[in-house]
C-alpha cells in the first residue's frame, strides 16, 4: 500500500518539462549549449590541457586538485573554487582541474545513454594523465554523486597500482537520498519516463532540466553499490587523507550518509577520516553562483571557510 501511494505521488510529480524551441536552445538539454570545458578553444579547464608541459619546479611544487561535479550538473559547479584561489596569493601553488563527467555537458541523448561507469571515466583519465606528466601532488574535490564515483574507485582498489592521491575532499556526498521517492521512481521508471528539475534560466544552461529514468536508474545503482561498500568497510590508500563536509539540512543527500562514510571509509591505519556536519540548507553548499534561493552572509562565510580549509590542508 505504501509503495502504491509512493508511485502515485511520483507519477504526479514526474511529467516532462516542455517549452518552445527558443527555450530549449537555452538549456543544456537542447544540444545548442555545451559545457565550456569540453571546448579547449574556449577555456582549458583541465590542468593537463592548460599546463601540458610542466617545468621541473611545477611537477614538484604545484598542488593539483581534480574537481568532480555531480549528477546532471556540469563543470560550472566547481567554478568558484579556482576563482577564489586566484584572489589569494598564498594559494598560488594550487591549481584546479575541472573534469566533465562522461555523458554530461552535451545534449540529453548523451546523458540518457551513459552509464555511471561512463560518468566516472574522465576522473581517472585526468588523474592518470597528470601522473604521467610527472605531477607529484594530486588531490580530489568532489560534490554529491561525484563523491560516490570517487568512493567507488577507492573501494574497488583503483589506486592500488597508481600513486596515492594526497587528499580526498567530499562535499555533500550522495550516498542516501533525502528524497525517498527515488527508489519508487526507479521502479516506475518505464511508466513515468522523466524527472524534471527546472531551475532559473541561467541554471538551465549548466544543469539538465530533464533527468531521464535511465539516468536515475544509473544513479540509484551507483548509490546502492557505494552504500554496500561503506557498510562492508574499505580503507584509503596509504598516504591519502580525507575531509568530508555534509550539510545538515540537505534536501538531496540524507545527512545519515555522512555517518556511513565516517564508519565505512577509513584511513590506511584504520583510523577515522575527518567528517563534519555543517549548518546549511543547501545541497552542494560550496556552490553559490546562480542560486535561486536567497543566500545569506552565513552561506558565503561557510563557502569561503571550506575553500580555505581545503587549500590549507593541501599545502601542509
Regions found by a protein language model. Name each.
Residues 152-166:
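Conserved hydrolase catalytic core segment
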